[in-house]
């Protein structure tokens, strides 16, 4: 009998393979053919174009075990995960599909046969639903399969609109859809609930296990239902639900996969109660997070990356609730790979990247989690009523990185609701402030609306005749301008490249007899190209013909930098992993800036490897080839596209040997060898999960190398050596410095011992305890600890507080002998003093240090110490 999840997956695929179906691998969780979907959320997603007749396959029957995520967008189960028996962010959808091959009867028969013969489920435990008008499905179930009429339930439009029914399936607001028939399993009368369609249908007794969709229509945005070219079948059965039945449990969280993950999470965190709901959340979330990262999604503040971040942070919060004190979430990945078996093939290949990304995100959130939870706890304790205000929810989001649903999750546990409307208002106000700041000093011409088109000739020429079709000054259309006027000039055709895709706009001149217009920038205005600049001499008017001349040197240098970003992108993906994707770029004549997704700083060795890889491709002198083709053809060829960019149906593809292929409308060199040299000048993080590389090429790269060489030679001269001996000389100097620092520390200890002898006499006795409170002048902060140790030895049973003020900063130390820490703790003592000098600190009960930023308050703060100690020694 098939019992484990892995056995069920294999049995399902084998059943349909033996019935003429092609076994197709699960597609990525990032839909490749549907921009309307955030994540793959059903088995049919990868076949959408097949159902629409737009994609031809060499098979008409298929079966899959599809990985799915439902978190964000229309299908969003995140809020319920952990609180119900069957909600998940990640699940596997077993499915069989017919593309114009078999239809209702065969689809129904396949489902019934697999359940009752292969899995041997008792027929009396099964009932089915159909759409209210689907008489054909009723006849098949009743007459041909033999299901009693009373076990066939008709479901009408129960969601307030036509075709809005549990038994009329649609993937989204538009697209393939049709009536469906669902198979339900009766878990028994010991569980509350009624049959589908009854008042008690929301109970957990009758559970839907298989949905058989009869794809007959393509729903338009207008709501019109157009017949599909060929009626088809799409079915889906959640593997978690059927596994629960086969393993004799009621909750999905009791099946083998979740038992393993829950036990491992409990072991890592140190929890003994395996029924904790937080363990369910963690076990569910590791599946969605790990597989999303394996499919190229990285935590970020937008789109898919933000949904991933929300899920990770929700899991981390639940771990914190269970008592986790260090990063734990990433440690579940090996167990996940083991328990998922064949379904984790892609995950196993990217295991190291997945673990690093999860750990980095977890550690980043841990820095603000405790403080954020503290603020939330205070707000909830002080709350009057049952609603947390939107301002507080926004503050937690904006300052501490708490997604709203994480705050709502905490509130839910205390029967508090969040003011979502208030949160959205606060968000809108922040966007308005950001927009206002961004518009400060804005160019009047930036918002021009130009109803014209400019043809671009700059791929093949840098100069050519053109006719002026419009002129704008200060946002207003004019017919002519005179010498000295600043304006935007629009031409009917231009070799000037308008800023786009990170490449800056061209500079140059528009010239005619006695006329020279200096172009300082080129921008797109809809379909028109605007040449921004100033008229140096003569007069210009609409209708005039000019010679448009691009600055060749600037264009050439820009092209070097643009072409190398393609090589850099490919090299980063090769060295760091295929999760790397471009997040932004700036390409100008002087340098290039490339932003990309990555979860940690790029190591020096990795940067060196990337740089060498790019320079190798430059030396290979690949010819750059460009081609216009359909977007689907480009993607089939493996062309990289920027996430979030909108592309036309026809795109331009730039290829550099077999190393790089990208969609790009920019201008490029003829061969990679033209770039000459590539040199990385810096690498840094600019946002969570986003890194930035700055680099130079060609002559600028040579100048950079020459500058580094000059600095190396200058350093060599200072060290009285040559460039070849700099490292050895510097190492010797550092060793000498360390020795001097060691000797200095020893000298300070001796001075501290001498100073302590003088200070002992300043101690006062409080209830038999020596108490020394002293502000020290001219004493280095680094000497305080040694001085405190000396004083403790001399005073024996003692409490000591020392403070110094230097360069606008306060340094404090408190020491308490071991016999007194039951009454006075050094950490509490130093924290009290630090709070009065604008600082904070802490440490052990016997010794603690702190700092502050208000030296003017040090005397008053130290004056509070004796009463504080006296009270505790009383």
From Swiss-Prot:
Family matches, as Pfam families: DHHA1 (PF02272), tRNA-synt_2c (PF01411), tRNA_SAD (PF07973)
Keyword Aminoacyl-tRNA synthetase found: yes
Known EC number: 6.1.1.7
GO biological process, one term: negative regulation of DNA-templated transcription
CDD domains for the chain: AlaRS_core
Residues reported to bind Zn(2+): 562, 566, 664, 668
EC class name: ligase
Annotated GO MF terms: alanine-tRNA ligase activity; aminoacyl-tRNA deacylase activity; ATP binding; tRNA binding; zinc ion binding
Localization in the cell: Cytoplasm
Reaction catalysed by this enzyme: tRNA(Ala) + L-alanine + ATP = L-alanyl-tRNA(Ala) + AMP + diphosphate
SMART domains noted in UniProt: tRNA_SAD (SM00863)
Keywords, alphabetical: Aminoacyl-tRNA synthetase, ATP-binding, Cytoplasm, Ligase, Metal-binding, Nucleotide-binding, Protein biosynthesis, RNA-binding, tRNA-binding, Zinc
Xref: HAMAP family: Ala_tRNA_synth_B
Domain notes: Consists of three domains; the N-terminal catalytic domain, the editing domain and the C-terminal C-Ala domain. The editing domain removes incorrectly charged amino acids, while the C-Ala domain, along with tRNA(Ala), serves as a bridge to cooperatively bring together the editing and aminoacylation centers thus stimulating deacylation of misacylated tRNAs.
Annotated family: Belongs to the class-II aminoacyl-tRNA synthetase family.
Record PANTHER family: ALANINE--TRNA LIGASE, CYTOPLASMIC, ALANYL-TRNA SYNTHETASE
Protein name, as recorded: Alanine--tRNA ligase
Originating species: Shewanella baltica (strain OS155 / ATCC BAA-1091)
């Amino acid at each position: 009998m098939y019992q484990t999840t892995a056995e069920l997956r294999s049995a399902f695929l084998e059943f349909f393979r033996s019935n003429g179906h092609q076994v197709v691998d699960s597609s990525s969780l990032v839909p490749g053919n549907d921009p309307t979907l955030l994540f793959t959320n059903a088995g049919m997603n990868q076949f959408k174009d097949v159902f629409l007749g737009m994609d031809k396959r060499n098979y008409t029957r298929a079966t899959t075990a599809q990985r799915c995520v439902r978190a964000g967008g229309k299908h969003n189960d995140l809020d319920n995960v952990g609180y119900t028996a069957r909600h998940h962010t990640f699940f596997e959808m077993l499915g069989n599909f017919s593309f114009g091959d078999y239809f209702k009867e065969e689809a129904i028969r396949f489902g019934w046969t697999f359940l009752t013969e292969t899995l041997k489920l008792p027929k009396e435990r099964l009932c089915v639903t159909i759409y209210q008008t689907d008489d054909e499905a009723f006849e098949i179930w009743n007459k041909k399969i033999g299901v009693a009429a009373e076990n066939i339930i008709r479901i009408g439009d129960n969601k307030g609109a036509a075709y809005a029914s549990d038994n009329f399936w649609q993937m989204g607001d538009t697209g393939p859809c049709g009536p469906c028939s669902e198979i339900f399993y009766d878990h028994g009368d010991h569980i509350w609930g009624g049959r589908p369609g009854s008042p008690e249908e929301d109970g957990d007794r009758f559970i839907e296990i298989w949905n058989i969709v009869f794809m007959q229509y393509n729903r338009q945005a207008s709501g019109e239902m157009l017949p599909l070219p060929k009626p088809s079948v799409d079915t889906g059965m959640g593997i978690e639900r059927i596994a629960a039945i086969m393993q004799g449990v009621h909750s999905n969280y009791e099946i083998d996969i979740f038992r393993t993950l829950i036990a491992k999470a409990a072991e890592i965190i140190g929890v003994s109660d395996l029924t904790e709901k937080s363990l369910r959340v963690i076990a569910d979330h590791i599946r969605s997070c790990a597989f999303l990262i394996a499919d190229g999604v990285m935590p970020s503040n937008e789109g898919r990356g933000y949904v991933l971040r929300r899920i990770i942070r929700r899991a981390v919060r639940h771990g914190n609730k269970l008592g986790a004190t260090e990063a734990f979430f990433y440690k579940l990945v090996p167990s996940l790979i083991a328990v998922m078996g064949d379904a984790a093939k892609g995950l196993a290949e990217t295991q190291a990247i997945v673990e690093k990304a999860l750990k980095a995100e977890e550690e980043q959130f841990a820095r603000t989690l405790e403080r954020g939870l503290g603020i939330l706890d205070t707000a909830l304790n002080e709350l009057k009523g049952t609603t947390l205000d939107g301002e507080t929810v926004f503050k937690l989001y904006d300052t501490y990185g708490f997604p709203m649903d994480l705050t709502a999750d905490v509130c839910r546990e205390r029967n508090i609701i969040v003011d979502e409307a208030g949160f959205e208002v606060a968000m809108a106000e922040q966007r308005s402030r950001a927009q206002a700041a961004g518009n400060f000093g804005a160019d009047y011409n930036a918002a021009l609306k130009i109803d014209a088109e400019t043809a671009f000739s700059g791929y093949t020429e840098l100069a050519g005749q053109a006719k002026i079709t419009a002129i704008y000054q200060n946002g207003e259309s004019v017919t002519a301008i005179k010498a000295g006027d600043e304006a935007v000039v629009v031409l009917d055709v231009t070799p000037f490249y308008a800023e786009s895709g990170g490449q800056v706009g061209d500079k140059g001149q528009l010239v005619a007899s006695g006329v020279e217009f200096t172009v300082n920038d080129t921008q797109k205005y809809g379909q028109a190209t605007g040449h921004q600049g100033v008229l140096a001499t003569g007069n210009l008017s609409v209708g005039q013909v000019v010679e448009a001349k691009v600055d060749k040197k600037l264009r050439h240098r820009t092209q070097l930098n643009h072409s190398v970003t393609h090589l850099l992108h490919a090299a980063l993906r090769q060295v760091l992993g295929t999760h790397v994707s471009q997040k932004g770029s700036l390409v100008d004549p002087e340098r290039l800036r490339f932003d990309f997704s990555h979860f940690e700083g790029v190591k020096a060795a990795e940067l060196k490897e990337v740089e060498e890889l790019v320079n190798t491709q430059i030396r290979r002198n690949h010819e750059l080839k460009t081609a216009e083709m359909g977007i689907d053809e480009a993607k089939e060829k493996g062309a990289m596209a920027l996430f979030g960019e909108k592309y036309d149906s026809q795109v331009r593809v730039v290829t550099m040997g077999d190393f790089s292929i990208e969609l790009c409308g920019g201008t490029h060199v003829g061969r990679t060898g033209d770039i000459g040299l590539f040199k990385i000048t810096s690498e840094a993080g600019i946002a969570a999960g986003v890194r930035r590389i700055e680099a130079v090429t060609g002559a600028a790269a040579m100048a950079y190398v020459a500058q580094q060489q000059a600095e190396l030679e200058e350093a060599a001269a200072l060290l009285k050596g040559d460039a070849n001996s700099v490292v050895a000389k510097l190492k010797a100097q550092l060793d000498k410095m360390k020795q001097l620092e060691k000797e200095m520390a020893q000298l300070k200890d001796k001075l501290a011992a001498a100073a302590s002898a003088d200070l002992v006499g300043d101690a006062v006795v409080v209830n038999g305890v020596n108490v020394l409170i002293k502000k020290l002048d001219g004493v280095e902060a680094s000497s305080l600890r040694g001085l405190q140790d000396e004083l403790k030895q001399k005073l024996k049973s003692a409490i000591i507080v020392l403070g110094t003020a230097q360069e606008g900063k306060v340094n404090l130390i408190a020491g308490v002998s071991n016999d007194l820490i039951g009454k006075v703790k050094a950490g509490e003592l130093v924290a009290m003093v630090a709070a009065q000098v604008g600082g904070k600190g802490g440490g052990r009960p016997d010794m603690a240090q702190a700092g502050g930023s208000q030296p003017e308050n040090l005397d008053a703060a130290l004056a509070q110490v004796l009463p504080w100690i006296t009270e505790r020694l009383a």
